[in-house]
């Protein structure tokens, strides 16, 4: 948003503050801001008065205009704009003038020498596209520098508004923040008011419109706007249309309240604010026909939609040259509803941009009254009706900030007078109490001030974070800190062929419902996207969303991990999420990921920190009933893993078999053991792979525990590397392939000794669990 320095000066005393200081302080304490200079380079460009217009003697499409450019100096200028009339004020580039990157010279048009150029708004850089010469209706002395007339050279503050600061989307809002930051007195421009009068039908059918105020003005004259309004619009990057439309835009920029004017003759029987009907169509002001549905809020009459509420007006009911009577609208629409309509229709306007960030419901009438005043002043007419339908009056929320909590966050107590001065400048009603401060959240800050910590932020940012003392963070002197540990985990996973992904922490409810998981406890009040308003409580949904996206882009082989935060009412924690799908990377032949690749990776991560996980059976609805497990560490649950349930994979249209895991990495790292020396083995290992057929329901973890106890110290490693179920092993059975790594510390194990140990183990398992050695 662009805000002229001179316009700010109408609301706050800025005589001792430069534009550069404003931008610097805003960037540090409010929103990012920069300074730019308005206008292109002009030299030798002046105001001229047309004294005579003649047709070109040979070229009928041209006119020869005599222009007074000094008290006694007149020049002839040839132009294609035949709308120029005697008495018009124009902007003239004299011979050798500079207009931006263009240099103007005398030029002959079939025997007539043009000693200058009449400039359009487009040539002056005021509008992207314009037709005809720019006409100035105000009376200036011929020869007046065009820079002075057009305001070129004025400093403009350009600010980048964050989604929660809709109150800053106006000159008034920026001035309010500046008043607080610089401790400057505000100015109070006069604000005319118009009481309710007359009768006009207005009905609000949809609860997403809390307030609708309409003013009928009869007998207006549609014409060009006065220069001061045009200049403000140009400085803010908005094209001038006509006096009525320009005034609605002018007031929107000034007060932050979008307005819309309807041609009253096109309104049949009053105004109804309702949801659009499916298949209903409207031709909008940009000339496009758009199909609507029930998600879109419209302003309609008894016959048809007239406008998309908060987004864009309809072409048929728009203001035209022959419009005589108008209905001026000022309203409050639900930000989420406006955002949904804007996204569905693919339109973002200055109006929707503000409604999406919440407008001040209590300023609906005051902003409109100022627009009415300007319309009567510059377009004439008479107010016939003022009708205000305010369904749900704004009730300010009470927020109490205890002094003690402020101290915990800021590191110091506040001075009552200073806090009161800041809150008063921000126009936040407050009462200083013995142990804190209580405020009533004003309507212009209802979107972002919800809790005591929001007040702490307001006080600290306005005061300036540089005024708070800081101390060097003292960390315990230990060998491996949290960050180093995470880097070690990331390196291990990358070495295994996995790629790190970083997902948004915001989720919608669809995946949670599909996975039959409880919805997250935390819901964002002001989400960037209305469909993603939950703060995730698991990484699995984020990873599945990534998998779906990659599949749709024909990337079916995936091995990814995410180290990210999940959120709960009690706080947030870091977790590790893993997703494997399709073929493994970096292999000479196609080799698919298997479930026990997950357990191997998990065990490898634990081994980095001197830990050993315990795997147990699990029953999670979104995982395959026979291919899943839980991870325990020293008897505590720290994660789960498994194959995504085939029905869910099919619903998500995922190709291949997705395997997922989630580890509570903070809890794992909290149990990290210091590394200790282990002597390099002197003797070679003996590896034996055996396949055991057993009941499908048998817990494999029990077999692994018994294997360790039976073989004892000679067993260096035991792990499952494959599971098979099918007709070759019989119904209700499964074949589990186990790898045994045997090693002696005193000498090389002979094959006979290794075979004897394996046979003894198989016989023991057969007797205890009824397993058979698969041949």
Curated annotation (Swiss-Prot):
One of its GO terms (molecular function) is ATP binding. Its cofactor is Mg(2+). Transmembrane segments: none annotated. The keyword Metal-binding applies. The lineage of its organism: Bacteria, Pseudomonadati, Aquificota, Aquificia, Aquificales. Its EC number is 6.1.1.20. This is Phenylalanine--tRNA ligase beta subunit. Belongs to the phenylalanyl-tRNA synthetase beta subunit family. Type 1 subfamily. The gene is pheT.
């Amino acid at each position: 948003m662009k805000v002229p320095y001179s316009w700010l000066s109408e609301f706050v005393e800025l005589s001792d503050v430069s534009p550069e200081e404003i931008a610097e302080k805003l960037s540090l304490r409010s929103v990012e801001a920069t300074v730019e200079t308005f206008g292109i380079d002009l030299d030798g460009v002046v105001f001229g008065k047309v004294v005579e217009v003649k047709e070109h003697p040979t070229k009928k499409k041209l006119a020869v205009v005599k222009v007074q450019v000094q008290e006694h100096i007149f020049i002839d200028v040839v132009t294609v704009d035949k709308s120029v009339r005697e008495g018009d004020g124009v902007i003239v580039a004299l011979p050798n003038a500079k207009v931006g990157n263009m240099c103007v010279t005398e030029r002959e048009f079939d025997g007539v020498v043009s000693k200058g150029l009449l400039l359009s708004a487009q040539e002056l850089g005021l509008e992207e596209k314009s037709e005809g010469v720019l006409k100035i209706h105000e009376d200036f002395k011929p020869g007046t520098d065009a820079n002075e007339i057009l305001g070129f050279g004025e400093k403009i503050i350009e600010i980048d508004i964050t989604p929660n600061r809709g109150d800053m989307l106006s000159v008034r809002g920026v001035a309010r923040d500046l008043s607080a930051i610089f401790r400057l007195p505000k100015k109070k421009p006069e604000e005319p008011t118009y009481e309710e009068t007359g009768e006009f039908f207005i009905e609000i059918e949809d609860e997403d419109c809390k307030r609708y105020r309409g003013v009928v003005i009869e007998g207006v004259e549609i014409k060009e706007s006065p220069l001061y309004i045009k200049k403000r619009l140009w400085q803010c990057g908005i094209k001038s249309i006509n006096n009525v439309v320009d005034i609605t835009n002018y007031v929107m920029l000034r007060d932050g309240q979008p307005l819309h004017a309807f041609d009253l003759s096109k309104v049949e029987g009053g105004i109804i604010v309702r949801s659009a009907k499916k298949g209903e169509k409207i031709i909008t002001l940009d000339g496009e026909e758009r199909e609507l549905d029930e998600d879109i809020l419209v302003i309609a009459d008894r016959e048809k939609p007239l406008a998309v509420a908060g987004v864009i007006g309809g072409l048929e009911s728009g203001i035209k040259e022959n419009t005589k009577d108008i209905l001026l609208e000022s309203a409050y629409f639900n930000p989420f509803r406006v955002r949904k309509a804007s996204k569905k229709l693919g339109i973002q306007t200055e109006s929707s941009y503000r409604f999406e960030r919440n407008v001040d419901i209590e300023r609906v009438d005051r902003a409109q009254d100022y627009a009415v005043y300007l319309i009567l002043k510059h377009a004439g007419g008479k107010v016939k009706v003022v009708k205000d339908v305010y369904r749900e009056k704004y009730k300010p929320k009470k927020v109490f900030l205890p002094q003690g909590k402020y101290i915990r966050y800021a590191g110091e107590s506040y001075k009552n007078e200073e806090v009161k001065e800041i809150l008063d400048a921000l126009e936040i009603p407050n009462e200083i109490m013995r142990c804190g401060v209580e405020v009533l959240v004003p309507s212009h800050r209802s979107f972002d001030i919800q809790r005591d910590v929001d007040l702490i932020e307001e006080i600290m940012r306005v005061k300036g974070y540089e005024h708070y003392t800081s101390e060097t963070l003292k960390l315990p002197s230990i060998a491996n800190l949290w960050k180093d540990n995470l880097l070690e985990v990331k390196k291990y996973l990358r070495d295994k062929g996995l790629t790190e992904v970083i997902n948004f922490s915001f989720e919608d409810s669809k995946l949670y419902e599909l996975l039959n998981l409880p919805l997250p406890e935390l819901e964002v009040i002001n989400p960037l996207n209305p469909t993603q308003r939950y703060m995730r409580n698991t990484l699995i949904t984020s990873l599945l969303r990534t998998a779906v996206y990659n599949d749709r882009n024909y990337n079916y082989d995936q091995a990814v991990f995410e180290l990210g935060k999940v959120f709960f009412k009690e706080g947030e924690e870091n977790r590790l999420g893993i997703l494997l799908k399709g073929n493994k990377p970096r292999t000479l032949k196609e080799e698919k990921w298997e479930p026990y690749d997950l357990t191997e990776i998990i065990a490898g991560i634990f081994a980095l920190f001197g830990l050993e996980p315990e795997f147990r059976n699990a029953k999670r609805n979104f995982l395959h009933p026979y291919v899943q497990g839980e991870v325990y560490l020293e008897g505590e649950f720290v994660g789960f893993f498994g194959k995504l349930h085939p029905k869910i994979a099919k619903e998500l249209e995922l190709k291949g078999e997705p395997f997922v895991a989630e580890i509570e990495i903070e809890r794992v790292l909290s149990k990290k053991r210091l590394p200790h020396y282990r002597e390099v083995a002197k003797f070679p290992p003996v590896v034996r792979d055996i396949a055991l057929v057993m009941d499908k329901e048998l817990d494999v973890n029990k077999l692994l525990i018994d294997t360790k106890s039976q073989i004892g110290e000679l067993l260096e490693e035991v792990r499952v590397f494959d599971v098979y179920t099918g007709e070759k092993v019989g119904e209700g059975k499964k074949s589990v392939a186990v790898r045994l790594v045997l090693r002696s510390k005193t000498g090389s194990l002979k094959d006979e000794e290794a075979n004897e140990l394996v046979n003894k183990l198989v016989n023991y398992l057969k007797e205890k669990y009824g397993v058979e050695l698969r041949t």
